[in-house]
Amino acid sequence: MLPSQSPAIFTVSRLNQTVRLLLEHEMGQVWISGEISNFTQPASGHWYFTLKDDTAQVRCAMFRNSNRRVTFRPQHGQQVLVRANITLYEPRGDYQIIVESMQPAGEGLLQQKYEQLKAKLQAEGLFDQQYKKPLPSPAHCVGVITSKTGAALHDILHVLKRRDPSLPVIIYPTAVQGDDAPGQIVRAIELANQRNECDVLIVGRGGGSLEDLWSFNDERVARAIFASRIPVVSAVGHETDVTIADFVADLRAPTPSAAAEVVSRNQQELLRQVQSAQQRLEMAMDYYLANRTRRFTQIHHRLQQQHPQLWLARQQTMLERLQKRMSFALENQLKRAGQQQQRLTQRLNQQNPQPRIHRAQTRIQQLEYRLAETLRAQLSATRERFGNAVTHLEAVSPLSTLARGYSVTSAADGAVLKQVKQVKAGDTLTTRLGDGVVISEVSAVTKTRKPRKKAANP
C-alpha cells in the first residue's frame, strides 16, 4: 500500500539551490582564520585559493573588485583572517566561501576585535548624535591629553600659539602606547573632569600602525570619553586612521593640528573680524547721522508747511472750491429734478384714466341693459314652464282623484291595501277621502272570484 502522504522529492538542481539559500540566509557573513594554499590568479583578476587548518579545508574565491582593496600579496602558507559569505556552487554542488576582505592573521585579529567592540558600543548608543556635547565658542581653556614627548603635543601647542597665544593650555601627560596606556588615558580624563579647569579636551596622538593606535580602541577609554562632562575632541593618528575613540568623542579631528584649530580662535581672523565690525559700526553711524539729518530736514519742512497762515490759506481755498462744487451740484440737481418732473407729467398725461373710465361706463350700461333683457326673458319663460307644470301636477295629483269619489285605504302599519289578503277580521283600517279620513274596523274579509276568460274560438 502507498503511504498516506508521499515524501518530498528534490531534483539535484533544486537540492543544490535549497542548500545554497540555507547557507547564505542562515549563516550570513562570518570571520574565518586559516592558512592559504593552492593560491591562483587567472587573467580575470579573481583570486582562488584554499583556506585550511590542521584538520579541514574549504575552497575560497575573492573577486577582483574585493581583492584590489587588499594591501599585501597573499602567499602560500600565510596565516590570514578573512570576512566572507558562505555559499554553494550549484553546478558542481561544491561548498565554498566568497571572501570580502582579507588581513594578515595578527592584524586581522585586532581588526576583528575592533569591529566587535564597535558593534557593541554602537548597539548601546554610545555613538548616537543625541549624546554629543557642543564645543564652547570660544574656548577659555584647553586641556590636552597626550604624550608629553610626542609630536602630537608639539603640533597642538604650535597651532594654538599661532592662532590664539592668549588661550590657556593645561597638559595632562599620559602614555599613548603600550599595555598601561589605556588606564593612564582613562585616569587623565577623569582627573581633568575632577579639576574642572578647562572647558574642552583634546585626546589623541600621532600616527602609527593599528597596534600603535590600539589604546584608543580600548573599551575603557571609549567609556571614559563618553562619561566626560567636558566636551572631548579626538585627534588620533592621520586622517585615514579611525578609532573607537573617534566614534565616541563629541567631535573627531583628522589630526592633532586640526583639533587645535577646531578649539581655538584665529587671532588674525579675530583681528579681521574686529576691523570689519569697526567698519560696519562706522558705516552704521554714518547712515544713522545721515538718516537723522534727513529726518530733521523733513520735520522742519513739515513745520513750515503747517504754519497757521499757510493752513488758513489752504483751508480758505478748499472752502471756496467746496462752495463752487456745492453750487454746481445744486444747480445740476435742480435741473435734473425739473427734467424728471417734465417727463413724469408727460407720462401722466399719456396715461390719463378719464377716457378709459368713460369707455368702461358705456360698456357697463350696455351690459346692464342686456342683462335686464335677458333676465326678463328668462323669468317669463320660467313662469310659463311653472304654470304648465302646475297644471300637469294637478291633473295627476291623488287629491284630484279623491275629489272625484275615489278613496285610499291603508292598514295599521301604513301600507296601502291592494289585496284582501293584506287584512284580517279585527284589523283597524284608515280610509282617506277627498275631504277627510275614516277609521274603521274589519268585521269580515270576503275574496271575490275573478271572472274566467272566454276560450278562443277554434
Swiss-Prot record:
BP GO terms, sorted: DNA catabolic process
A Gene Ontology term for the protein's cellular component: cytoplasm
Main location: cytoplasm
Transmembrane segments: none
Superkingdom to which the source organism belongs: Bacteria
Pfam families, sorted: Exonuc_VII_L, tRNA_anti_2
Family matches, as NCBIfam families: xseA
HAMAP family membership: Exonuc_7_L
PANTHER family in alphabetical order: EXODEOXYRIBONUCLEASE 7 LARGE SUBUNIT (PTHR30008:SF0)
Protein name: Exodeoxyribonuclease 7 large subunit
Source organism of the structure: Escherichia coli O17:K52:H18 (strain UMN026 / ExPEC)
